[in-house]
From Swiss-Prot:
CDD domains: PRX_Typ2cys. It is an enzyme of class 1 (oxidoreductase). PANTHER family: THIOREDOXIN PEROXIDASE, THIOREDOXIN-DEPENDENT PEROXIDE REDUCTASE, MITOCHONDRIAL. GO terms for cellular component: cytosol. Residues 2-163 form the Thioredoxin domain. It is found in: Cytoplasm. Keywords: Antioxidant, Cytoplasm, Disulfide bond, Oxidoreductase, Peroxidase, Redox-active center. The active site is a conserved redox-active cysteine residue, the peroxidatic cysteine (C(P)), which makes the nucleophilic attack on the peroxide substrate. The peroxide oxidizes the C(P)-SH to cysteine sulfenic acid (C(P)-SOH), which then reacts with another cysteine residue, the resolving cysteine (C(R)), to form a disulfide bridge. The disulfide is subsequently reduced by an appropriate electron donor to complete the catalytic cycle. In this typical 2-Cys peroxiredoxin, C(R) is provided by the other dimeric subunit to form an intersubunit disulfide. This is Alkyl hydroperoxide reductase C. Its EC number is 1.11.1.26. Thiol-specific peroxidase that catalyzes the reduction of hydrogen peroxide and organic hydroperoxides to water and alcohols, respectively. Plays a role in cell protection against oxidative stress by detoxifying peroxides. Pfam families: 1-cysPrx_C (PF10417), AhpC-TSA (PF00578).
């Protein structure tokens, strides 16, 4: 299901916060508080590709934070399994302390509302959503289970959204922060593409 341009489905669910506090009523929209948010799903704790992605999101947390973007992760595991995973060192298959909320979707309602439940296994596919400050999904990527995400590309998409909002220009293929955009007109694209002639 493609959710880009749609309102993000809100949810209230148990979560473990960055201070290891467990809350029963984590409200995504309330937590986002008008800021852009990266919401990402992984299949299960204590598995194989998942810890590499979560550790990478955590490693780059400060890059998202300085762009005023919050990160929230979701899987079908209980908050107690999330907590145990955080309390396990990476060398032992854990993830260590994490600087963003990890939500528990034990009833699978959240992953179903985002349309990313695996059709046979009942777990989430590797999905990421960039929700803007107006609560609109602006970018989504969904990977099959064996394939890890490129977390730095999500930062690039955050930068592209910010660039478009500030300047009204569109971002060409492989655009990176600091590069020129394209004025969304026939003249603008002709001017941009003329450098390839």
């Amino acid at each position: 299901m493609v959710l880009v341009t749609q309102n993000a489905p809100n949810f209230i669910a148990p979560a473990i916060l960055k201070n290891n506090q467990i809350v029963e009523q984590f409200d995504l929209k309330k937590y986002s508080n008008g800021q852009s948010t990266v919401l990402f799903f992984w299949p299960m704790d204590f598995t194989f590709v998942c810890p590499s992605e979560i550790i990478e999101f955590n490693k780059l947390h400060s890059e998202f934070k300085k762009r005023n973007v919050k990160i929230v992760g979701v899987s079908i595991d209980s908050v107690y399994v999330h907590q145990a995973w955080q309390n396990t060192l990476p060398k032992n298959g854990g993830i260590g302390k994490i600087n963003f909320p990890m939500v528990s979707d034990v009833k699978h309602d959240i992953q179903k509302s985002y349309g990313i439940q695996h059709p046979n296994l009942g777990i989430a596919l590797r999905a990421s959503f960039l929700i803007d400050s107006n609560w609109i999904i602006r970018h989504q990527v969904v990977n099959d289970l064996p394939f890890g995400r490129n977390i730095t590309d999500m930062i690039r998409m955050v930068d592209a959204l910010d660039f478009h909002n500030k300047f009204g220009e569109v971002c060409p293929a492989n655009w990176k922060k600091g590069e020129e955009g394209i004025t969304a007109s026939s003249e603008g694209v002709s001017q941009y593409l003329s450098k390839y002639s």
